[in-house]
Structure formats: structure tokens, C-alpha cells
Amino acid sequence: MKIVLRVEGLRQNYGGVQALRGVSFELQAGECVALIGPNGAGKSTCFACLAGQQKALAGSLVWRGYDLQQSTVEMRTRLGVARTFQVAQVFEALTVLQNLQLVLQASRGVSMRDLLAECLLDEARHWLFQAGLSDLGEEMLRSPAARLSYGGKKRLELAMAMAGLPDASQGLMLLDEPAAGLAPEERTDMMERVKRMAHLGATVLYTEHNMDAVFGVADRVLVLIDGQLVAQGSPQEVAANQEVRERYLGQTFSLSKEPVRA
């Protein structure tokens, strides 16, 4: 498989405290990779540097040949980089459809009048379907997003992230705890959709504290502790890594979940 993201020697400091200490890894096209570690390990900082919300102190970030260190958030979106957050970031005062329309307007460079065209309304509904919101009635689609459940807002944010990319099947999806706060059935469905995104060609990097959503879903696992990448490999390799068990997973951890199929 083709390597599409190279992260080399990534460093970031906060007031003299090293948040990232020379982190290096590569991602291949169509991979679904989990980034795990305890709170404060540097996962969110790594995501912020990749997404352009922060500029790394040192190191290189190369996505499909483009230097992300020299790219703004807007440029990264055009290059196919999207991020979601642990707490869903949606415009609650706007309707569900308006949230999607706003993203489409920004990413497609079209006027608000053009957004009312049936083809773009159909595209908005397409992304809602991909995120698992196809069962929303017309009344709910035209209601404020604040009326959605927590899980509904997480799905809407995922739909917005996919809709904002030039080609979601070629994009880099940075998903910060996509299943956090969801009921077990919702969590399973969400992670199946995350896996499906990679199956369709997107490169997915996500964080999670729920180990079922990690070891039952990811193709590979990266382990970040105290700002350093201490292990990476298949779920089986990482679960068997003695340092990871001692410093994070615990000695009694075992792989008990069947892998999620896309």
C-alpha cells in the first residue's frame, strides 16, 4: 500500500513542558489506525499539529507530498485533511441541513443561492446517510441541530467533516474519540462507519479510550506515552507489548472483541 502521511521528529512544547518528543510514524492509504495513550500523553496535540490548529515546534508533516507545516487550516482542508473533536462541534442554532450546506458552501466555493439547488441538497443528504442519519425525518432535518441527541451531533459532525473534503475517499480523517459518550449499540455502529471509511479509501487516524473501539477496529495501533511513541504495530503485537501493558493497558488486558468488519 502507498504511504500517504509521513510524520518525522514532531516536537511541541507548552511553557517549557515537552508535549511531543520527536514523534515519528507513517500511514498508508486506506489504513484505519488508532492512536492511544493515557490522558496528557500528547494525542490531542498531535492532532492539532496535523490539522493545523497548532504549528509544531519542530519536525515534518508530509501528506501526499505536501508539507503540512507550511499549510493553513483552509489549505489542509483543500488537501483533504479533516478533523472531528471529542465533544461534537456543530452549529446548534442552525438546522441539520444548514450545517451541511454551510460546509458545502465553504468547500465548494458556491453561493448561498446555489446551495438551494436540489443537487447540493441531495449531496447533503448523502453525507448524512454515510454518517448514519438517514432515518431523520424532514421535520428534524430542518430543525435546529440542538435538538439532536448527543450521538446525533457526533454523527452530524462526522458528516460535516466528510462533506468538507474534495474527495472523502482520498482524505485524511482525524477523529478524536469518535465513539466517546455513545451507548454500546451507537458505539458499535459508529466504529463500523469509521472502518468503512478506510475500506472505501480514506486514511483514518483516531483516538479512543474504549479499548473495544481500538483493538476490534484498528488495522494498526500507535501508543503515545509522555509525548513519545513507545510502540506501534498490529493490535495483537501492541496488546502483547510488555512496556505498553505495564505503563498503560495493565497486565490483565486481553483481546476479547471480534474485529469489526467494514
Q: Residues of each region from the PLM?
A:
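Glycine-rich phosphate-binding loops of nucleotide-dependent enzymes
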Residues: K2-R6, L10-A262
